């Protein structure tokens, strides 16, 4: 059962950096629905993309799986034999709850849940990889190496789904979308104190890139095609395709 997010409703004397700890994991479903515009749409559409791209006898990777929402969406839309989903997160609290969520929904496609660092995971025989609001928490200099590894591990015809919060080179547009995002959170019941305290904790941990930067990295990794397929305010998702015909 998900609890309502009230983590930052009272003043916190010493705000440290953001961590995905037990307290965050407990309220995460409520938090992300009220904080990330379009999140439910992205999750459901990841399932539709899985139906199109996942191939028989291949693997799907959900890197930074949190509580397993994307994994469950993918699994509901896999209709091939001998597929496997590998869901990875480095937060013990998230992994514990992810196991419960996955176990609560029975389906023929097996899910391997791994507590570990996505930078250390081998990507092999993949028809689809999901990075759903994960890359932004890696150090910027480490992001290209991960995308390179994903491209190498994807089979021809495979897809990467990359969802992120974006920054914007046009500061006027950036400010507008930033303010609209804050309006969205206010409309969902967050106070100015909650918004401010959470932002302070995230600012040194979540470092955002522009869509142009993401596309440049994807191109450098080898992806022949990439495009923004969803955006709401300063949040969105890209799909990157590896050319070729699935075996």
Curated annotation (Swiss-Prot):
Reactions catalysed, as given in the entry: prephenate + S-adenosyl-L-methionine = carboxy-S-adenosyl-L-methionine + 3-phenylpyruvate + H2O
InterPro entries listed in its UniProt record: CmoA, Methyltransf_25, SAM-dependent_MTases_sf
GO biological process, one term: tRNA wobble uridine modification
PANTHER family named in the record: CARBOXY-S-ADENOSYL-L-METHIONINE SYNTHASE (PTHR43861:SF2), TRANS-ACONITATE 2-METHYLTRANSFERASE-RELATED (PTHR43861)
Subunit-level organization: Homodimer.
Function in brief: Catalyzes the conversion of S-adenosyl-L-methionine (SAM) to carboxy-S-adenosyl-L-methionine (Cx-SAM).
Similarity remark: Belongs to the class I-like SAM-binding methyltransferase superfamily. Cx-SAM synthase family.
Protein name per the record: Carboxy-S-adenosyl-L-methionine synthase
Organism annotation: Citrobacter koseri (strain ATCC BAA-895 / CDC 4225-83 / SGSC4696)
Primary gene name: cmoA
